[in-house]
Amino acid sequence: MRRFSFIFCLLLLLGLSSCEDFLKQTSQNLVTPTTVSEYKDLLQGEGYFQEFSTHARFINFMTDDMEYINYPGSSPSTSSYINMYQNVYCWSQEIENDNFKDEWYGYLYSQVLAGNICLEYLDEVLGSDAEKKVLRGQASFQRAYAYFLLANTYGEPYDATKLGEKCIPLTLTATPVTERYERATLGEIWAQIKSDIAVAVECLRDYSAASNFEINYDAALLLAQRVALYMNDYQLATTYGDMLLERKCDLWNISELGPMLTCSKQSNDGPSVTGQTEGF
């Protein structure tokens, strides 16, 4: 009798464990990256600022490079772009516009996340030291450029005398947290941008990218120069610029270019024009 009871209990335990395994939920399309190559694919798929122009279009309307011309027979109400962006260049504290939603902020933080994921798990993935170095450089560039755009859109301009002023939230991890992100200071944000782009320049120095559509050394030098320029570090900007010109010495004289139009309507005196046409 004891023997039969033991066998019954054993079969019951096996059955319960089998049911537990059967009921476990697994995603049919979930892939966990394990190699440097897979993380590079993740960075290119989730990062690389895809759909950049779509989300950043309204930024142009915040500058004096845009001009609205009311052509005969046209009306602002008939232009989706005017309807959507007409309040962007407005200094009111409270602005209501049901036609426009600022998706630029969230989009840029999704680009930060792509870089953070690669950097956070870099030491755990399979790959050579050389491959990891390239991924570190590309992910650092990704994060630096995203924070550069965020800081310049939603923060005060860089000012060495106001480094304690609040800027934007700063996160360097891909791990979700329940606490609300606090705004970092101007000094903290720009120090991180400068640090990340310096890492990108160093890590990509000896890397020959497979195509121009991959984050490379030239792109890192160009962004590094721009960051130094925005930080009023003209000596460092000159250094990065000279390094880039040694590699890419062909210059384009932009003074020979005519006015650039954002639509097909011709203008004689405006640098950029948007009108009724939908050709943006």
List the model feature ranges, each with a label.
Residues C19-E67:
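Membrane-proximal, proline-rich intrinsically disordered regions
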Residues A114, I189, D196, C203, ...:
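Alpha-helical solenoid repeat scaffolds, predominantly canonical TPR units
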Residues A151-Y158, S208, Y230-D233:
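Short coil/turn linking the two alpha-helices of tandem helical-hairpin repeats
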Residues Y81-Y154, A184, A198-D206:
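Conserved, well-structured interaction surfaces
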Residues L13-L16:
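Bacterial Sec-type N-terminal signal peptides, specifically the leucine/valine-rich hydrophobic h-region
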Residues A56-F58, N232, T238-F280:
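Hydrophobic-face positions in mid-chain alpha helices that act as interaction patches
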Residues M1-F4:
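Positively charged n-region of N-terminal signal peptides that target proteins for export
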